[in-house]
């Protein structure tokens, strides 16, 4: 293959990737006011400026686009957790909540999608989100096992603790999305979030796990 042909192929592939991302971004914008089940293919392609048939070069269906959005949104959630682990503070819980607030503000549309579609009308997307959350729980359980005193915990107990933390985090995300940018409401959400996570942490400290 000549250099020109190779460059042309690369350019076409780059254009295809850009169009695919444009479709995801457009769907996310349109979903700010509705659910995936009510969003039409024509709405998304009109937003991007391509003909409806061109959609199928990138996704087999709107359900497949929704699964891709779920995976993209979960990458945002994972990046937030990595950020929290990478930036230890004197008060780990306050620091984690601060990072959560910051990330929800920066990536509000991703978190809105996860919260709304977790129990939404598209089965493939519900399953994709549930699968991603289970994987997240497994990763967090592995992290918890590295803490002093938790290495000998029963794996089921580690997973239970991880799932509690993930559930707590999602409830905080929902509260942040509901309260919006209002300072007083935000302060109340942060206070409740910190107390909620401290309660989980205290329970973990006093839990007597018996290895099986």
Regions found by a protein language model. Give the residues of each.
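N-terminal intrinsically disordered/low-complexity leader segments
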Residues: 1-18, 208-212
């Amino acid at each position: 293959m000549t250099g020109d042909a190779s460059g042309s192929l690369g350019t076409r592939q780059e254009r295809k990737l850009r169009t695919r991302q444009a479709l995801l971004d457009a769907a996310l914008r349109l979903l700010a006011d509705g659910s995936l089940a009510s969003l039409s293919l024509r709405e998304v392609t009109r937003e991007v400026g391509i003909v409806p048939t061109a959609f199928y070069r990138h996704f087999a269906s709107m359900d497949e686009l929704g699964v891709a959005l779920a995976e993209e949104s979960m990458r945002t959630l994972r990046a937030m957790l990595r950020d929290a682990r990478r930036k230890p503070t004197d008060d780990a819980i306050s620091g984690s909540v601060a990072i959560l607030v910051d990330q929800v503000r920066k990536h509000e549309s991703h978190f809105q999608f996860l919260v709304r579609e977790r129990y939404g009308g598209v089965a493939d997307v519900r399953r994709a989100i549930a699968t991603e959350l289970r994987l997240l729980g497994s990763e967090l359980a592995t992290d918890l096992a590295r803490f002093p005193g938790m290495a000998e915990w029963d794996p089921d107990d580690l997973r239970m603790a991880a799932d509690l933390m993930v559930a707590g985090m999602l409830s905080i995300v929902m509260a942040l999305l509901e309260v919006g940018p209002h300072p007083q409401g935000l302060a109340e959400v942060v206070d409740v979030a910190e107390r909620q996570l401290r309660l989980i942490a205290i329970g973990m400290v006093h839990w007597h796990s018996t290895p099986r």
